[in-house]
Amino acid sequence: MLADDAAVESVALSDSNLLDRFGGSGIHVSMSTIAPETARDLAEHHAKKGVAYLASPVIGRPDRAATGTLFLLLAGEGNAKQKVQPLLKVLGQRIFDFGEKPWIANTAKLIVNFNIVAAIESMAEAFTLAVQNGIPRAKMAELLSETLFSGVAYKGYGDHVARHEYEPARLSIAVRLERRAPGFTARSRN
């Protein structure tokens, strides 16, 4: 998975003729989190070269990838999706199919990321209120993540927020996502 839109475009659309190397029967599965507009442009470029383009951004951190327990969002041409299913099943515990338009999977992923950022912000505010009233941050994290909010965002990020652990790479992605989310939501449309 590449870091951002520029990296994906650099690899897929550079002078290296990557798309020509695929030939008419190739399938490019992009698992990066990129803007829907970028995915739409990539799909158009791929179609011109006769290469199938699938978007399959993932939900899960590197430790989930190592254990094959990612969640995968998938969109693109049906036959191409069918061909890559065996590979994707090795990487993830579940595949969510978002239809024929690749950029829809990227839109769904950015919506997920927006909710992760909202959860992190909510936890930070809750922990601040807790500390101001004599409740330890760790105790509040435990309460939230084991009762009302037992989902991945609270369990996966709650302890880090409670311990003020934002680096290396634990929550730095959230800062980048938060910067992108307002622009994404303002521009998003099908």
Stretch-by-stretch model annotation:
Residues 7, 38, 79-80, 122, ...:
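Short phosphate-engaging motifs
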Residues 1-37, 71-73:
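Rossmann-like NAD(P)-binding element
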Residues 104-190:
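Helical "substrate-binding/catalytic lid" subdomain
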Residues 18-22, 45-46, 129-132:
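A short helix-coil junction within the Rossmann-fold of NAD(P)-dependent oxidoreductases
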Residues 2, 46, 88-95, 148, ...:
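Structural signal for hydrophobic packing residues in well-ordered secondary-structure cores
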Residues 11-12, 33-113, 117:
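Rossmann-fold dinucleotide-binding core
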